[in-house]
């Protein structure tokens, strides 16, 4: 996925959370970036951080959001569900983030999203494709990618219609 893709999602999260906290006074707008910073999927966590940092730098350089600067707070879930819940609790309770970009693995996003939803913290996942991420009707949980049950149909149609079954 391109850095532009992550920047757009990060910008959407930043604007959405800023609008929701316009009366909340704080020196920085803290946004969590949660994903696998270590382990077999660490490359994805690195991409998350690079994209989020590029977006935060651009927004901050332009004056921030309502004059407030974005500060990123990283959370390494290593694509382990228990660790993801611990990261979510830390981001909400200790770091006091107003929004989260992440998690990557659906198996992490589903339990971590419960923590964010309970706290009223917006979460946007750039990579979790399991339909349950958004089917549960949690108000503050969003995704920027297709669902597993949609991707197969689109891929199948492409193979039949464009590649002619090759």
Regions found by a protein language model. Name each.
Residues 69-94, 151-154:
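Structural motif
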Residues 2-13:
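Bacterial N-terminal signal peptides that target proteins for export
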Residues 25-27:
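Boundary at the C-terminal end of the N-terminal hydrophobic targeting segment
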Residues 49-72:
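Signal peptide-proximal N-terminal region
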Residues 12-22:
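Bacterial N-terminal signal peptides
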Residues 82, 94-166:
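Extracytoplasmic ligand/sensor domains, especially the bilobed periplasmic-binding protein
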Residues 37-41, 74-77, 98, 139-145:
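Second-shell loop/turn segments in exported
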Residues 32-51, 75-82, 104-107:
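Extracytoplasmic "Venus flytrap"
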């Amino acid at each position: 996925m391109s850095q532009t893709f992550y920047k757009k999602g990060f910008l959407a999260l930043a604007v959405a959370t800023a609008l929701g906290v316009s009366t909340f006074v704080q020196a920085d707008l803290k946004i969590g970036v949660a994903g696998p910073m270590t382990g077999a999927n660490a490359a994805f966590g690195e991409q998350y951080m690079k994209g989020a940092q590029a977006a935060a730098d651009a927004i901050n350089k332009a004056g921030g959001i309502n004059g407030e600067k974005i500060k990123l707070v990283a959370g390494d879930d290593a694509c382990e569900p228990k660790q993801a819940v611990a990261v979510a609790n830390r981001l909400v309770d200790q770091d006091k983030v107003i929004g989260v970009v992440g998690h990557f693995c659906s198996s992490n996003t589903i339990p971590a999203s419960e923590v964010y939803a309970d706290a009223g913290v917006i979460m946007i996942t750039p990579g979790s494709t399991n339909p349950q991420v958004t089917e549960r009707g949690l108000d503050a949980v969003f995704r920027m990618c297709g669902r597993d049950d949609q991707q197969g149909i689109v891929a199948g149609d492409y193979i039949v219609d464009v590649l002619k079954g090759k």
